[in-house]
Amino acid sequence: MESSSECSSISDFQDSTEGDDANTLPENLCMREYVVICDYVATDNTQLSLCSGDKVLLLNAVSQDWWWVNHNGTCGYVPASHLHDALNEQEDTEVNDPWQDEEYYGSYKTLKLHLEMLSDVPRTMTYQNVILKNSSSLCGKHILDLGCGTGIISFFCAKFAQPEAVYAVEASKIAEQTCRLVEQNGISSLVHVIRQQAEELDLPTKVDVLVSEWMGTCLLFEFMLESVLQARDRWLKEDGVMWPSTACIHLVPCSAYKEYSNKVLFWDNPYQLDFSLLKPPATKEFFAKPQPDYILQPEDCLSEPCTLFHLNLKTLQVAELERMNCDFTFLVHTNGLLHGFTAWFSVQFENLEEQGHLELNTGPFSPLTHWKHTLFMLDEPLQVQKRDKISGSVVFERNSVWRRHMSVTLSWVISRELKMQKVGCKVFPIWR
């Protein structure tokens, strides 16, 4: 889906509204249908309040930022950034492999991704610590390690605990190497490698613990979590343990001057030449989708982060993954440029032998992981001041066709001393 750009201040277009009647439908205009991509609440009687999914007819693109539209016979102004051209919706609904299993499992059959994951010390050591701190409780238990890869978590279980059995399930071809590693390390009596997809899994018994490292970009991308939840429902005992036990998605408004400078401002004067006409296409090319390998520095955070979603993996249902939405409010703590928002996730592991939990946090205030951070760039930076309020909403929506993909819709309002300064909305596909 093509993403929209953010809007400028309301005051920029007020002069053009004088004399217009918000309830009069202009005649003899070529009208085109647009879809509202996120809710908008009118701030005066020249504007329309709209909900996500509403359809409107464009009557007049008054400015780049504010359009005059008709909705169910009523006319008014709405931010252009909240609208998407209905004619550009070209999603292919007839695909042979909506899960892209061949591509997905193919990416895990070589060592490249496994080297990246095993080299991620915070990630891998967190799982090791979970096993170590709960080793007594794992004695004599049946453990399911779903999506085991090279089997590192299963190896930890065999080495540090005394389980009855570990079922190391892996659907990709790397399972052949995992079998050899189990033999080589002399743990084949404990660890049973099963090359199957989770949905086809057939175990000899239900398990006491289901452990998996299923997290992707923005926590959910690839949606391996669906397979984990299905395995939970089929194979985890009623009083069984899920590791991770809970998961959270976090967000913060941020400055990203270097990113914006390197990819947009660069075109102003390369080699003393004016290439500035390339700035709009550069913005669209580089910022239409999120930056998944961004490293956010703590000093670039413009406020304290917030937790958008808190998922209980013992009770979460697959249907809840289709669409998740949340409102947010940030209080800006320093003057600066708002270039966008950065997201990351954390997962928590229930302790069985003492109170509290262990946590793997992938955010900018914790040791860097291979997930890094996900940057959602605005099309243009916005000036903010200390004590400004940034409020809005975020919607995570799963792609109805390409089931491993999703979109993130961010809408925001910047307010200063109770007066709205800027309003905008942008849709980011990850990745279709």
From Swiss-Prot:
Question: What is the catalytic activity of this protein?
Answer: L-arginyl-[protein] + 2 S-adenosyl-L-methionine = N(omega),N(omega)-dimethyl-L-arginyl-[protein] + 2 S-adenosyl-L-homocysteine + 2 H(+)
Domain annotation SAM-dependent MTase PRMT-type: ranges: 101-405
Q: What is its main location?
A: cytoplasm
SH3 domain sequence ranges: 29-88
Gene3D superfamilies cross-referenced by the UniProt entry: Hnrnp arginine n-methyltransferase1, SH3 Domains, Vaccinia Virus protein VP39
Q: Where is this region: Disordered?
A: 1-22
Can you say where in the cell this protein is located? Cytoplasm; Nucleus
Query: What keywords are annotated for this sequence in UniProt?
Result: Cytoplasm, Methyltransferase, Nucleus, S-adenosyl-L-methionine, SH3 domain, Transferase
Q: Which organism does this sequence originate in?
A: Xenopus laevis
- Biological process per Gene Ontology, one example term: negative regulation of DNA-templated transcription
Disulphide bonds in the chain: none
Q: Please name the Pfam families in this protein's record.
A: Methyltransf_25 (PF13649), PRMT_C (PF22528), SH3_2 (PF07653)
Which GO terms label this protein's molecular function in UniProt? histone H3R8 methyltransferase activity; histone methyltransferase activity; nuclear estrogen receptor binding; protein-arginine N-methyltransferase activity; protein-arginine omega-N asymmetric methyltransferase activity
Q: Mark out the compositionally biased spans (Low complexity).
A: 1-11
Binding positions for S-adenosyl-L-methionine per the UniProt entry: 114, 123, 147, 170, 199
Name of the molecule in the record = Protein arginine N-methyltransferase 2
Family statement drawn from the similarity comment of this UniProt entry: Belongs to the class I-like SAM-binding methyltransferase superfamily. Protein arginine N-methyltransferase family.
Q: Which residues form a coiled coil?
A: none
State the EC number(s): 2.1.1.319
Q: Which InterPro entries match?
A: Arg_MeTrfase, Methyltransf_25, PRMT_dom, SAM-dependent_MTases_sf, SH3-like_dom_sf, SH3_domain
Function of the protein = Arginine methyltransferase that methylates the guanidino nitrogens of arginyl residues in proteins such as histones. Involved in growth regulation. Involved in embryonic dorsal development.
Quote the cellular component terms of the Gene Ontology held in the record: cytoplasm; nucleus
Q: Which residues form the active site?
A: 213, 222
How does it associate, per the subunit comment?
Answer: Interacts with ctnnb1.
Q: What class of enzyme is it?
A: transferase
